[in-house]
Every structure is written in structure tokens, then in C-alpha cells.
């Protein structure tokens, strides 16, 4: 990823990715991509994935608890992926069409995209649409360890840890 230095007083626009710039939930779409690509392995994860999703949506567990209690699914699967960069390219070849048209009309060179989507996946689409500044979740693909979850309140913390008190013109 590429982070920039803001000129004194210059405000930036910050965009959430899923359901703002991207038509849908990229996490769900990447899950479906791997379900088609590797149905036997992904099918094994569906019961626990579903349980985690339901418990989270009902408010029974928080984001960090989801990672703590269910993160091993991601860890175990990530280490089995042979060529993540090839998969990401293939995924965006199929799903790039889900980038909403409005964004190209208002895009500015210093926009920042913030997403729960892992940076390894987010980076490819940002490169394709000309966005240099993005923050996402961080997953070490060699060992499957989740290093940063960029979700809900963590998005603000991630932004501040990278950009400090950079002024924000609009947050979409």
C-alpha cells in the first residue's frame, strides 16, 4: 500500500469500500469465489462460518472475539492457498464490474479507501481504479495470522495510526 503525507490543512475524502464504492460485500464475494474454486474445502468451513456470523449479528460476540474464536479457520485455509496473487487477479477480473460508476466521476488523487477487506485483496482493485491510498485488514498469508482487523471502530483507529490528525473533508 502507499501512504501519503498531507499538506498542512489539506483535507481528504475517505471512503468505505463495501457497499459504498463496491456494490456488495467483498468479503462475502471472495468467500463465494473460493467456494466455487475449492468447494470441498470451503464447504467444511460453512457450519463454523455460519455460527460465527449468526453469533456476531445477534451481538453475542464482538469482532475481536470472532477473530479469537474462529480465526483458526482463516489461518488453516490461508496456508493452503498456492498462488494468492493469481487468485486475487482472477477474483477482480470477475468482480471489478461491481465498482460503482459514481466513484470515477468524483474520484480525487488523494482519496483514502478504508475497508475490512484484507489489503492484499484491496490493493489489486485500488491499483486498477487508480487509488493510491488505502487501509484494510492485514493478514500474513504465509501463516494465516490476522494482524489487523479494519472493521467498525477499528477503521478510525487504523486511519489515525497511519495519517494522524489529517483533516477529513468527507467520510463516505
Residue ranges and their predicted role:
Residues 29-36, 44, 48-51, 68-73, ...:
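Charged/polar, solvent-exposed surface patches and flexible loops
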Residues 23-27, 63, 67, 152:
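Generic structural signal for well-ordered secondary structure
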Residues 49-77, 126-134:
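Short, compositionally biased "basic patch" segments
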Residues 65-101:
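Metal-dependent phosphoesterase signature
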Residues 2-58:
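Active-site neighborhood of HAD-like aspartate-dependent phosphohydrolases
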Residues 18, 37, 58, 72-76, ...:
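A general boundary/transition motif marking the beginning of the first structured unit of a protein
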Residues 2-12, 87-172:
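C-terminal cap/substrate-recognition subdomain and adjoining C-terminal extension
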